[in-house]
């Protein structure tokens, strides 16, 4: 389980900051009940806490992590375009993610609960434009984003679904 107090890897500790081209990445953990969820905010280069920004929450596919989403440069590019982005590791969503829960204990429904918990935390930030909260989901993260948005219609402005695994719902 992820330990928020101490880590062998300082790069996953709360508040760890990385300057990237045109944006800043900051580690920010949140919780779903007793489970710790590892995540990162990406802020535009000219970020100002007193302003509001459209926000994209990015959800990875099964067996993947937020680092895989990062490698595609999606969070970085969106932040460079003026969005605040939050990426995270689903609890149990991967064998090598940083969040709590064993891979064998993860389901689409537990991931839906994780995404909803992430949304709740993100929405508390003063700089979030509440009318412009977007969900981006890849593969199973696309299915989870669609299911979550269906339950939280008033909270989601739009979705970006990249090869969503809708077939899972049929199985």
Across the structure, where does each feature detected by a protein language model lie?
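N-terminal cap/lid segment of alpha/beta-hydrolase-fold proteins
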Residues: 6-50
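Short beta-strand element of the alpha/beta-hydrolase
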Residues: 51-61
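The serine-hydrolase catalytic nucleophile loop
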Residues: 64-75
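Conserved alpha/beta-hydrolase
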Residues: 79-98
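Alpha/beta-hydrolase active-site loop
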Residues: 104-126
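Alpha/beta-hydrolase fold nucleophile elbow
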Residues: 127-139
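Glycine-rich nucleophile elbow surrounding the catalytic serine of serine-hydrolase chemistry
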Residues: 137-147
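Hydrolase active-site cap/lid region
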Residues: 150-171
């Amino acid at each position: 389980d992820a330990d928020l107090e101490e880590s062998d890897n300082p790069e996953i500790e709360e508040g760890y900051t990385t300057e990237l081209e045109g944006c800043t990445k900051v580690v920010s953990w949140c919780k779903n009940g007793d489970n710790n969820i590892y995540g990162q905010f990406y802020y535009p280069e000219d970020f100002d806490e007193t302003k509001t920004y459209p926000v994209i929450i990015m959800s990875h596919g099964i067996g993947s992590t937020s680092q895989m989403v990062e490698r595609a440069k999606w969070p970085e590019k969106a932040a460079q375009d003026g969005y605040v982005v939050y990426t995270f590791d689903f609890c149990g969503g991967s064998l090598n993610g940083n969040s709590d829960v064993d891979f064998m204990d993860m389901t689409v429904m537990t991931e839906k609960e994780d995404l909803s918990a992430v949304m709740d935390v993100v929405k508390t930030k003063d700089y979030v434009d509440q009318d412009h909260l977007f969900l981006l989901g890849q593969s199973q993260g696309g299915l989870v984003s669609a299911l979550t948005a269906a339950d939280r219609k008033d909270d989601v402005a739009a979705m970006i679904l990249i090869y969503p695994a809708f077939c899972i719902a049929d199985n």
